Structures are given as structure tokens and as C-alpha cells.
Amino acid sequence: MEDDQDEEQTALVCDNGSGLVKAGFPGDAPPRAVFPLTVGRPRHQGVMVGMGQKDSYVGDEAQSKRGILTLKYPIEHGIITNWDNMEKIWHHTFYNELRVAPEEHPVLLTEAPLNPKANREKMTQIMFETFNVPAMYVAIQAVLSLYASGRTTGIVLDSGDGVSHNVPIYEGYALPHAIMRLDLAGRDLTDYLMKILTERGYSFVTTAEREIVRDIKEKLCYVALDFEQEMATAASSSSLEKSYELPDGQVITIGNERFRCPETLFQPSFIGMESSGVHETTYNSIMKCDIDIRKDLYANNVLSGGTTMYPGIADRMQKEITALAPSTMKSKIIAPPERKYSVWIGASILASLSTFQQMWITKQEYDESGPSIVHRKCF
């Protein structure tokens, strides 16, 4: 059949996080296009006379012009909230970043765990009706991270810019009743670091300065194995201090802020949240699962997402889970070095599997059944 050959075209893989878009073709390492998931619109119409001003800017261009723009993030806490802006981001991804015609490629998208049904339908509709894709599929981010680690059973802590989730997965299927969501992630940690650096006498307030603080966070922060002990060390010596050069040449020194910032993941009360830390949510999620599979979950505890990149986080997690779990349980934390991109890598693996090729939702199926087809084919 002629049509079947057509379906063999290279897939496009697009992972939309709250902070970054990761997009490309299966086999790319790292993903070909990584850019901020943001849309900027001019604050004042007609300010830039004669500069061929556009009504909107996407991604890196929006970031670089942020002085004259209002930046909007169409994904909040992992869930798409502004479809017009999201469409702009997909358009930018296909036409400007990857330079492909979406009508010629099947597209694999990712979604947050517990994504509302209406949202999945809307994603499906936009892909087929706006971008005319020949086929598409929507996969859950945490499940893809687990695949990327070479497993089909385990529990994933996926923490990005806007949201963190604990997702227990058994033989490839997420267990929705036991998923934990924590609205605490990279963006909150950047905000908290801005706050505690201000207490030290440095002032970071604007969106431009926020980017600097994010860089400080990514380069210098780490998770302490024992927070109290680390605080004592920091108080009694300067061994933990590091310096950082700002763009204007000023050098700042950062001490206990280096580990106080990510400690928030384990003690959300630092930023006034009444939630459990990521170690407790992991434990609670496992406890909501059938007693027979808990052993497999403890033994396959996979970290994923940019906010799990802090040095020391795996050891600390191991220590905390061991303290919570029954003494007979062997717990193991898996922290793959490429975990910043593991959702994307898992999606890229999935799209390449020969067994996956019959899973795509085709244009024909969409035309016959409408957007609700997504619930039957993607789960």
C-alpha cells in the first residue's frame, strides 16, 4: 500500500515544558531545538518605528528583547493555559527552529501527568486542523523519562521549571490514582534565590536580573546531605563560598545560599508552602500503590527534569527515602546524567520503535472520530 510507506517519514518529537521547548528528530542528541517557552508582545505599540516591529516574538528572540516586551508563558505548572500563544510556539518550533513542514511528518507531543481531557483534545485538534499533520500521538512526560532509563516499571520524580510530579508506572502505564503533583519547581527556586541574595545585600528584581540568578542557581547550587550540618559548616568557615561574576564585571560571593535554595525541594516551608517535600511525596505516592508492586517502585526511583540536576540530590533522596521506607525495602535512586532531556530522549526512543508505528493517530482516524480519538489511542 502506497499510504503505509508515507507513514514511515521521520517523526518530529516536541516536548513542551513550562520553561523550555525541546524539539527535534529521533536520534538527535541533545534535541536540535531547545528554547524558552515564552511569547513576548511589545509593551508599547509603535515604539520601534521603522524597525519592522512584529506583533509578537517567540523563544530566544523574546528573551533577548525582554526589555521592551511583556513576556507570557503559555504553559503554567505543566498545563497549557493559553492556546493562541501555544500555537505560536508550535509554529515557531516547526517553521523557524526545525525548518520542516509539519504536514509531512508525524508529530509526537508530550503532556503533563493528569492533563485535563479537554486539553488533550485541543492539542490533537490544533495538530490536525491548524498544522495538518499526517499523524500524531501524545505521551505522558514521566513515562517517557522512565523509558529513557531503560525501564517500564518504576516511580519517576519529574521536576522542571513550573511543576513537579511523582508518577508511579507499572509495565508502561502510569497509575493515575497515585500521582502526586507539587506546584514547586525551578521557577520557585529561582525566585527564592533572588530573595535570599537580596537579604545578603545584592539586588535582583527585573526579569533580566532573574535570568542572571537562574544562571547562578544552575552553576553554583547543590543539595546538602545533612542540611543542619552544612549550615554549621557554612557558619564556621568560608570553605563553601563561591564567587560569581555578573555581566557588568561586579563579583558577588555566595555561601549558604548555594544549598539553602534547593533545600526548598525537601522543605517547602522555606517559601511558605504547606506541602510535603519531594521525598515525602515520593513515599506517599508509593504507599498509594498496590502493596505487591511497591518493592519494584522503591528499587527503580528515577529522577528526571532540570530541577533534579543539583549535585547531591540523588544521595539526599536515597537517605530520605531509606529513612521513610520499611527497613526490608531496598531503595535505589537512578539519576541519569542526561536527565535534563530524558523526557525528550524517551519520546525519541518511542517514536523510533517499530512496534509504535501502529499507535499513531492518523489523519483518517481523526477525520472519522474527532478529537476524542486521543483518549482511545493515547493512554
Swiss-Prot record:
A cellular component term, taken from the record's GO annotations: cytoskeleton
SUPFAM superfamilies, per database record: Actin-like ATPase domain
Region forming the signal peptide:
none
Task: Tell me which SMART domains the record gives.
Answer: ACTIN
The keyword ATP-binding is assigned to this record: yes
Checking CDD domains in the record gives:
ASKHA_NBD_actin
Which reaction is recorded as catalysed by this protein? ATP + H2O = ADP + phosphate + H(+)
**Pfam families referenced in this protein's UniProt entry, alphabetically:** Actin
UniProt keyword Cytoplasm, yes or no: yes
User: What would be an example GO MF term here?
Assistant: hydrolase activity
Q: Which keywords does this Swiss-Prot/TrEMBL entry list?
A: ATP-binding, Cytoplasm, Cytoskeleton, Hydrolase, Muscle protein, Nucleotide-binding
Q: Where in the cell is it found?
A: Cytoplasm, Cytoskeleton
Q: What is its EC number?
A: 3.6.4.-
Q: What does this protein do?
A: Actins are highly conserved proteins that are involved in various types of cell motility and are ubiquitously expressed in all eukaryotic cells.
Its subunit composition reads: Polymerization of globular actin (G-actin) leads to a structural filament (F-actin) in the form of a two-stranded helix. Each actin can bind to 4 others.
Q: Which family does it belong to?
A: Belongs to the actin family.
Q: What is this protein called?
A: Actin, muscle
Record organism:
Styela plicata
